Curated annotation (Swiss-Prot):
Fe(3+) binds at H81, H83, H251, D326. Zn(2+) binds at H81, H83, H251, D326. Belongs to the metallo-dependent hydrolases superfamily. HutI family. It comes from Streptococcus pyogenes serotype M6 (strain ATCC BAA-946 / MGAS10394). Its cofactor is Zn(2+); Fe(3+). Its EC number is 3.5.2.7. Pathway: Amino-acid degradation; L-histidine degradation into L-glutamate; N-formimidoyl-L-glutamate from L-histidine: step 3/3. The keyword Zinc applies. GO terms for molecular function: imidazolonepropionase activity; iron ion binding; zinc ion binding. This is Imidazolonepropionase. One of its GO terms (cellular component) is cytoplasm. It is an enzyme of class 3 (hydrolase). It is found in: Cytoplasm.
Length: 421
């Protein structure tokens, strides 16, 4: 087979044999590091991988040849938890955070999520589209090729749908692949204050059926937390969503452990997100149910909290984990997955291989894209992040710098030395 594109002489390729399930426990520590590696691409797919000189049959008169001495390649990075589409910003809350005002107190004062809800409700489709596109551009320039994007800053049907429509439009227009999550249950809107059950009924009866009918989202999510939605309320919504055919995610155990992990396990959610306050019993329940733990260390960093999710304990117990940005305007205003990956080492005490497995193959399982992306594997899409680094460890050792040299998306050179092509 003659390749369309042949990428050769990488210092290292980060490869693995996808076992057919999210990596857990000791599997997280394993990868195949191919020295002097090459990748052959045809019709947007990886058709060959190896070390040294490529087979002669891969090279034809039209084959594009590029050499990458001194560089490494990983699968395209996957950010599987973002709040991508929103209006406004919340830098005016930063001084309160520095003064130690708790997040839930800011929310109770009309700030936090509800502040962004007001800004998002007043924002036009075009405003939201352009703002979200800029974030996606930034992500792409840092090596991200697939992004999960939640609604949740409307808390009414008109605005929630506008957010989902923006995601759908960007999925068509932008190189990054987007996976849509419906999260109208991100907070209790002011018009339903004191009556969350009534709001959930509106979501179940009036919103979810239309989202499903129009295929606007693949996942449904809820914020199960003190002063937001209880475990029973979360179970009520997610069970109805599951009956309608949605895959499930849940924000759980971020500030307090109030039963969200139990709901995730009972309903076999694909992932439980945050988990800073998870207990040993909660870890065991998620392992038993096969729920992926989606950890968001940049949120803990941004909130200036001391308690990070117990990633080391989770992996050692046999749990599958991912890492994501939680990109949002309040608790985590970043879109930099390289920073998150470095926090995975510095603050969660994970090894570089564990972090890379978390943000590639496990993240692909978290967004139900494991058949297409998440590993440098023959037959998968050629989503490739190429770093200006001599080896895998250097990605984490030399921190706080964008080390991306190039990005390939579906076999097309999409980013080249700081420019989107």
């Amino acid at each position: 087979m003659v390749a369309d594109v042949l990428l050769t002489h990488f210092n290292q390729l980060f490869c693995l044999n996808d076992p057919g399930h999210p990596l857990t426990g000791q599997e997280m520590k394993k990868a195949t590091i191919v020295e002097d590696g090459y990748i052959a691409i045809k019709d947007g797919l990886i058709v060959a991988l190896g070390s040294g000189e490529p087979d002669a049959e891969l090279v034809g008169p039209q084959t594009i040849m590029r050499s990458y001495k001194g560089k490494i390649a990983t699968p395209g990075i996957i950010d599987c938890h973002t709040h991508l589409v929103y209006g406004g910003s919340r830098e005016h809350e930063f001084a309160k955070k520095l003064a130690g005002v708790p997040y839930l107190d800011i929310l109770a004062q009309g700030g936090g999520i509800l502040s962004t809800v007001r800004a998002t409700r007043s924002a036009s489709f075009d405003n939201l589209y352009q703002k979200s596109k800029r974030l996606l551009d930034y992500m792409l320039l840092h090596g991200v090729t697939t992004v999960e994007a939640k609604s949740g800053y409307g808390l009414d049907w008109e605005t929630e749908k506008r957010q989902l429509d923006v995601v759908a439009a960007l999925e068509k227009d932008h190189p990054i692949d987007l996976v849509s999550t419906f999260m109208a249950a991100h907070a209790i809107p002011e018009e339903y204050k004191g009556n969350p059950k009534a709001y959930l009924d509106v979501i179940i009866k009036d919103m979810l059926p239309v989202v499903k009918e129009k295929n606007l989202a693949e996942f449904c999510d809820i914020f199960c937390e003190k002063n937001v939605f209880t475990a029973d309320e979360s179970r009520y919504l997610l069970s109805k969503a599951k009956e309608m055919g949605f895959k499930l995610r849940i924000h759980a155990d971020e500030i307090a452990s109030i039963g969200g992990v139990d709901v995730a396990a009972e309903l076999s959610a694909v992932s439980a997100e945050h988990l800073m306050m998870i207990t040993n019993d909660g870890i065991a329940k998620l392992i038993g149910a096969g729920v992926i733990g989606n950890l968001l260390p940049a949120t803990t960093f941004s909130l200036m909290e001391d308690t990070y999710a117990p990633a080391r304990k989770m992996i050692d117990a046999g749990m599958a984990i991912t890492l994501s940005t939680d990109s949002n305007p309040g608790s985590c205003p970043t879109a930099n997955m390289q920073f998150v990956m470095q926090l995975g080492c510095f603050m969660l005490r994970l090894t570089p291989i564990e972090v890379l497995n978390a943000v590639t193959i496990n993240a692909a399982y978290s967004v139900n894209r494991q058949e297409r992306v998440g590993s440098l594997t023959v037959g998968k899409e050629a989503d490739i992040a190429i770093f200006d680094a001599p080896n895998i460890d250097y990605l984490f050792y030399f921190f706080a710098t964008n080390l991306i040299h190039q990005v390939y998306k579906k076999g097309q050179l999409t980013v080249d030395r700081g420019r989107i092509l």
